[in-house]
Amino acid sequence: MEIQFLGTGAGVPAKHRNVTGIALKLLDERNAVWLFDCGEGTQLQILKSSIRPRKIEKIFITHLHGDHIFGLPGLLSSRSFQGGTEPLEIYGPVGIADFVKTSLRVSQSRLSYPLKFIELTKENDVIFKDKQFTVRCNILDHGITSFGYRIEEAAHEGELQVEKLQALGIPSGPLYGKLKRGETIVFDGQEINGQAFVGERKPGRIVTILGDTRKTKNSVTLARRADVLVHESTFNKHEAKMAKAYFHSTSQQAAEVAKEAQVKQLILTHISARYLTKEAYQLQEEAQEIFPNTKIVKDMDIIEIPFANEGGA
């Protein structure tokens, strides 16, 4: 599991930062990619990455401002043009279906795959769940309807302790599969309980990706004990009044959310073009005053999300 940042800028594309596009790469987990927001130029950024559009299984839109959705019609059309046939689901605020359907209709674009819309209307709602993942959403504070998303991975079964089995002379093969499932087998007249040879279950990972927002209690709820929190940082710590007026957050407000939620790592994105490279890293330093494990990302950065016992992100 890893996150690739296709665009880390705010408002409009800039020379060094495209507008928002975040890919949660679940290739090992389900051979799929989930995309969070799709600002103008996102598909060009995808071309610079290893992501294949046909692998995009779900798209989660945080809100309907242009810097988060203007790249969507083009990406959907290109996915079809490139031979994509796998179904695609789009989650987002009420209006996302109308935006996409109107864009496709006016441009006379036809898709080669089924497209399903799930428009969100409830706070603190489970919007997707299967054996692997649960996705929750909650409303943020951005003037227009804006959502944050919490992706919870189910626990992983413990590893089979092969060395212990080999010490008993049990050969690899079908018996290992039964033992891995916790079944009891008979080997050389002795009962072997598989549960005694399977390690502890690994807790699933949690990723929280927030849309544009002021600091709000819902942000803390969504981020509670997450392995990674992706939070906007549109303004520096000296511009709190401006952040409030424009329904955005400062670097230190993002850090306060991370600290209150007890997350493991804070990722800052949605960086204004007013902050060049040096000034942008000052945002990181400001946040680190409150939450040390903070990183500001640039376009195309990849953040790996290991299991808890494999070290920090």
UniProtKB/Swiss-Prot annotation:
SUPFAM superfamilies recorded for this chain? Answer: Metallo-hydrolase/oxidoreductase
**Official protein name in the record:** Ribonuclease Z
**Quaternary structure and interacting proteins, as annotated:** Homodimer.
Question: Which family does the UniProt entry place this protein in?
Answer: Belongs to the RNase Z family.
Pfam families xref list: Lactamase_B
NCBIfam families on file: PRK00055.1-3, RNase_Z
Presence of the UniProt keyword Zinc in the record: yes
Q: Name one GO molecular function term.
A: zinc ion binding
Q: Which UniProt keywords apply?
A: Endonuclease, Hydrolase, Metal-binding, Nuclease, tRNA processing, Zinc
Function field: Zinc phosphodiesterase, which displays some tRNA 3'-processing endonuclease activity. Probably involved in tRNA maturation, by removing a 3'-trailer from precursor tRNA.
* Active site location: 67
EC number of this enzyme: 3.1.26.11
Per the annotation, how and in what number is the cofactor bound? Binds 2 Zn(2+) ions.
Q: Which gene encodes it?
A: rnz
What cofactors does the UniProt entry give for this protein? Zn(2+)
**Signal sequence interval, chain numbering:** none
Q: Which InterPro entries match?
A: Metallo-B-lactamas, RibonucZ/Hydroxyglut_hydro, RNase_Z/BN
- Give residues annotated as binding Zn(2+) 2: 67-68, 212, 270
Reaction(s) catalysed (UniProt annotation): Endonucleolytic cleavage of RNA, removing extra 3' nucleotides from tRNA precursor, generating 3' termini of tRNAs. A 3'-hydroxy group is left at the tRNA terminus and a 5'-phosphoryl group is left at the trailer molecule
Residues the entry annotates as binding Zn(2+) 1: 63, 65, 142, 212
Q: Organism, per UniProt? A: Enterococcus faecalis (strain ATCC 700802 / V583)
Q: List the disulfide bonds.
A: none
